[in-house]
């Protein structure tokens, strides 16, 4: 895809930009800076930019079935958040084993459950990064009623939480293992089945967050690889997009037609000459993406 299709939207200077989510209601993309405990909003129509600060790392965001109400994953727990008033209320889920481990990437499934992975905690109380390692990570599913279940164990850095357009395949990654896997997903009871290797040892950076398009292709961001790859359902590489920064972290589709791929990046490793590291980027795509799944609010 031509470089002309890529532009820097916000030079946010994020230490670790993550978890972009498109909100159709206000025509905005929201995303986080994990290390600075921030949530950003960029409104596309008037190009306004807003930021909120939280009391610990903000690792993932999800819209809910109640307009204006978000689920926010912090390093240690989940909270409900209403951006218009900045009201914040504990969800009830607290990560077992924190602060040895922390939460990381997460999203809602087609049934309204929230899936989120954990990892060994590599963040100091002030947000500075330390080295990550181990296989302490767990993939959790939290139901609308608040029931918690474990579905994958032994993860290094849990990343990528995506579903195929028909909901029948779940994609997830372990950054430390340089692996993206595809699981069969039962849309009746939100359980995982057989696992297959999907993108293993690709060689250009390591797998971070991803986005799914309407054709069933997974766009995987490559931390340290300076780009994103579009991967067909059979695991073959369909397209490679280069960015002028090395550490690409996550992506989501947005815009009125869902044909803009918003991409987050990280400045925390201070690569020489990367003045736009930590920016939010936008890539014009021919194939639209999927609208975000919503966390279901229990009656």
Model-inferred region functions:
Residues 38-40, 77, 137-140, 179-181, ...:
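A short loop-to-beta-strand structural motif that recurs across blades of beta-propeller domains
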Residues 183-190, 284-290:
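Short loop/turn segments immediately following beta-strands, especially the blade-tip
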